């Protein structure tokens, strides 16, 4: 699979700006959502090739978003990479158990984001 369109979900405007810069520098399309509900709707309407998903968000957290995406046949195969300050081994293991294909700890490192994109 070739990644052409990336959805980034984070309730932090600063994090979205940073990831947007990285994604655009790789000549990819960038779309964003700032909460879980919008993330699910955006994933269904935009059908991105990859989702970078924050774990800690108000309302619906990243794990709940992941479960909803996996329930829907249209979105269940979109790879999700969690991006979070919750980066202890237990958090990473839980993310993998939820179906995540990768994990990038915050603060965000440009190389880590680009490596995740290259995986797909």
Predicted segments with their positions:
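C-terminal output helix
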Residues: 17, 108-117
């Amino acid at each position: 699979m070739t990644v052409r369109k990336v959805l980034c979900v984070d309730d932090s405007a600063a994090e979205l700006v940073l990831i947007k810069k990285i994604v655009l520098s790789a000549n990819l399309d960038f779309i964003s959502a700032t909460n879980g509900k919008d993330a699910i709707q955006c994933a269904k309407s935009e059908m991105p090739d990859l989702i970078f998903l924050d774990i800690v968000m108000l309302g619906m957290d990243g794990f709940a978003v992941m479960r909803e995406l996996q329930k829907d046949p249209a979105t269940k195969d979109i790879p999700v990479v969690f991006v979070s300050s919750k980066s202890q081994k237990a958090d990473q293991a839980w993310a993998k158990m939820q179906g995540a294909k990768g994990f990038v700890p915050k603060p965000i490192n440009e190389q880590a984001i680009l490596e995740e994109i290259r995986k797909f």
